[in-house]
Amino acid sequence: MSKVMIIGAGGVGGVVTHKCAQLPEIFSEIILASRTESKCKAIAEQLDRPISTAQVDADNVPELTALLEKERPSLVINVALPYQDLTIMDACLAAGVDYMDTANYEPLDTAKFEYSWQWAYHDRFKEAGLTALLGSGFDPGATNMFTAYIAKHYFDEIHELDIIDVNGGDHGYPFATNFNPEINIREVTAECRHWENGEFVETPAMSKKASFTCPEGVGTYSIYRMYHEELESLTKHYPTIKRAQFWMSFGESYLKHLEVLENVGMTG
């Protein structure tokens, strides 16, 4: 059993906290921390077991380090904004705490994300005897594990890899994102990159469209090629890959609203 600190009290933070609370044999103590502690308390009230909450500015390394040193968790699960990955990693190094996140770092003022900034921490975490587990959501995360599994158990080499992210549900809203709206819009409107013969090739955002029929009667969906961070890590660790692409489905209503936001200058 161990103590975990979850940083971030948005939609993803709420889901992570609920899941950790269901596993007391693994997470014996939970601390949920955010810049706005009232959001943490609102999540805590929904749970079947008590957890602690705290206020912290994840951009402030000394403040976060002090909280980590006070609480001494075994692990930090970072589900704050990707802009804050590096400061949280710095605080974990200073306090001697293992680190996990679900999305790689991107600068606040530039819609560009890549692993180089976080991979640069590798030696420091290794020398400190700490673990930093990056991209541990579904995509990236589960998609990486699926790839590793088939590479180990089914194929001698992987030459082409297509990751297709389809949401088979319908929440009924004309426009709503599944995670932080700002990050979602930045991701969708960024230049597309896919791996082709040893290098990344850039194409305009959402310019490549295809139709995909999901198995088990889920349905047929329009999918669009876009860049996603696991393409960077998978092509690094599986050098036999000649082509790697990431695709995501979007409904017509979502695309219509996104176009309006672009036309009025709210996505740049």
Please annotate each region the language model reported.
Residues 12-15:
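Hydrophobic/small residue at the entry helix of a nucleotide-binding pocket
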Residues 29-31:
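Short beta-strand element of Class I
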Residues 36-38:
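Helix N-cap at the beta1-alpha1 junction of Rossmann-like dinucleotide-binding domains, i.e.
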Residues 47-60:
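Rossmann-fold cofactor-recognition segment
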Residues 58-72, 80, 84:
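Conserved Rossmann-fold cofactor-binding substructure of NAD(P)-dependent oxidoreductases
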Residues 103-130:
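Rossmann-fold NAD(P)-binding glycine/threonine-rich loop
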Residues 152-268:
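C-terminal catalytic/substrate-binding lobe primarily of soluble NAD(P)-dependent oxidoreductases
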